[in-house]
Amino acid sequence: MIRAALVLLVRIYQRLVSPLLPPACRFYPSCSAYAVTALQRHGALRGSWLTVRRLCRCHPFHAGGVDPVPELTPKR
């Protein structure tokens, strides 16, 4: 439920806010696409943490590049 709400917020940002701004993300996939994938793959808590870490790296002094969402690690 929380995961779906967070994904919805990112989707709203993608549809309403992002088109008004110039492209600025230094990574592939974009930070918002990364957020959706991270939330869907890892859930609300870990997906949010991964998204915050990614957003903190998205600045002019970081090289950027390809930065995929980590795969789920199997539990022992």
Swiss-Prot record:
Keywords: Cell inner membrane, Cell membrane, Membrane. The keyword Cell membrane applies. Its main location: membrane. GO terms for cellular component: plasma membrane. Pfam families: YidD. It is a peripheral membrane protein. It is found in: Cell inner membrane. It comes from the Bacteria. Could be involved in insertion of integral membrane proteins into the membrane. Belongs to the UPF0161 family. This is Putative membrane protein insertion efficiency factor. It comes from Anaeromyxobacter sp. (strain K).
